[in-house]
Amino acid sequence: MFDFMMLEKVREKGPLVHNITNIVVANDSANGLLAIGASPIMASAKEEMDELAKMADVLVINIGTLDGELVTAMKIAGRAANVAGTPVVLDPVGVGATSYRRKVVQELLAEIQFTAIRGNAGELAAIAGEAWEAKGVDAGVGSADVLSIAEKVANEWSTVVIISGEVDVISDGTRFAKVANGSALLPRITGSGCLLSAVCGSFIAVQDDAFRASVEACASYAVASEYAEIELERKLPGSFRPLFLDALASWSVEKTRAKAKIQESGEHK
């Protein structure tokens, strides 16, 4: 079902990805998007959100480092993107960590129709109202079924859900896929999940089926990380980061097809 040609579409079209993101990851996200052939813009002034919504091919909202002005900009941008027909991706970083983050995400979900939501299991469990022990912005631990969480959030908010982890889970509420790829070094570099949200956004920008786009984005991203790890002399995060950027830039459809481990099903049983 997956031919992994969306990567070539991203390179061909160079979608403009508007990121309202956090101060920790902005540089890495921009460079990662450039590496895959997308065109990033990192803008958060509320005064220009309406204009950017008409220009951008996708909007990616990341709540990693929040403040009141930024939240206002997110809401303006998201509403304007909905009016313009621009897809919107939410990365609810650390939503389960504080009551303020939970409040902001609930407001965003109430005011904006999101095409996709990408986060770790703890973040999506918080949105689903499932018990989970959050650990700051990390996944933490919990016993809830990840597929059930994905299904619940996808159906409640009419969106595609991407839950990142050792095995990524993607669902639109009726279709489900698991991607069992990825380097163990990815969680050891800050912002790897945030960049994945932006990469998912760039794939969604060139494909009407957000579920298919998200599965291909996750698989391609994870396979690239595996190739980066192969090039390492020492399995250390500082050495891995630049090699991963290079791997993103040298992605090929053939490499992804050769290594992607995708399990797809039509329903969650």
Swiss-Prot record:
Substrate binds at residues 42, 191. Pfam families: HK. GO terms for molecular function: ATP binding; hydroxyethylthiazole kinase activity; magnesium ion binding. The keyword RNA-binding does not apply. GO terms for biological process: thiamine biosynthetic process; thiamine diphosphate biosynthetic process. It catalyses: 5-(2-hydroxyethyl)-4-methylthiazole + ATP = 4-methyl-5-(2-phosphooxyethyl)-thiazole + ADP + H(+). Its cofactor is Mg(2+). It comes from the Bacteria. Keywords: ATP-binding, Kinase, Magnesium, Metal-binding, Nucleotide-binding, Thiamine biosynthesis, Transferase. ATP binds at residues 118, 164. Belongs to the Thz kinase family. Catalyzes the phosphorylation of the hydroxyl group of 4-methyl-5-beta-hydroxyethylthiazole (THZ). This is Hydroxyethylthiazole kinase. It comes from Listeria innocua serovar 6a (strain ATCC BAA-680 / CLIP 11262).
